[in-house]
Each structure stands twice: as C-alpha cells, then as structure tokens.
C-alpha cells in the first residue's frame, strides 16, 4: 500500500499508474477524505485534552456545587467526543477502503498494453521445471 504522503505529493503519477493498470480509483476523493480525517483527528484530540483537563479540575475542586456543575459540563464534552469519534470511524472506513484499492505505481520501463494478452516476456531466468504428474 502506498503512503498517503506519497499519494498527496504525486497525485498525477498515482492516477497515471492506476490508469496504466486499468484500475479505477478516485484519488481526489481519497485526498479530500484524508483532509477530513486529519481535521477530525485534530478535533478529537483537542476534545480529549479538554476532557482530561476537566477531569483534573473536578478532582481538585472542593466545592460540591462547582463540582456538580463541572460534571454536567463534562457530560456534554463526552457526548461531543463520542459523536466526533463515530464520524471519524466512518471516515476512516471509507478512507481505508479507497487506500486499499490504490495500486502501486508501475515502473516506467514496463510496456503498456490494454489487456493481459499483450504482456511480453522480457527476460527468462533458469530452466522451467517439469513435473511427472
């Protein structure tokens, strides 16, 4: 599987390689999904940091009323975190399904053909084995 950084930097080469292998892959959709994935990762990490800070503050708080208020706020943060994580999981599923479909880029010396029948044997090494069955 190709690295997403390589795909971003060499979008045209990857598109041409997929076309050369007769594989249809939407590279633009992959990159937009990756942007969304990175954004959601950033958001979930910031919410998680906020959640951790609130947990620490709740533990330090002595006043029961203030503590109860903080716990109520924490529930809202937790719900937001869960919704963002669900959204991230969905984006990750789609992102991974496209990433798996992206083929490796063929070598530039590979001859082009429209089907498997047009493949050429470029080099033979060793002898072919014959089996008695």
Question: Positions of the model-derived regions?
Answer:
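N-terminal alpha-helical targeting/anchoring segments
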Residues: 1-128
């Amino acid at each position: 599987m190709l690295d997403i950084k390589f795909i971003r930097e060499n979008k045209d080469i990857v598109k041409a390689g997929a076309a050369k292998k007769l594989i249809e892959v939407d590279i633009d959709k992959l990159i937009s999904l990756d942007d969304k994935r990175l954004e959601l990762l950033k958001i979930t990490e910031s919410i998680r940091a906020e959640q951790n800070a609130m947990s620490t503050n709740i533990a330090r708080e002595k006043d029961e009323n203030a503590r109860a208020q903080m716990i109520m706020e924490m529930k809202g943060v937790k719900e937001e975190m869960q919704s963002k994580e669900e959204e991230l999981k969905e984006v990750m599923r789609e992102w991974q399904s496209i990433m798996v479909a992206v083929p490796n880029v063929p070598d530039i010396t590979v001859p082009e053909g429209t089907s498997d029948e047009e493949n050429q044997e470029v080099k033979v090494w060793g002898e072919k084995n014959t089996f008695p069955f």
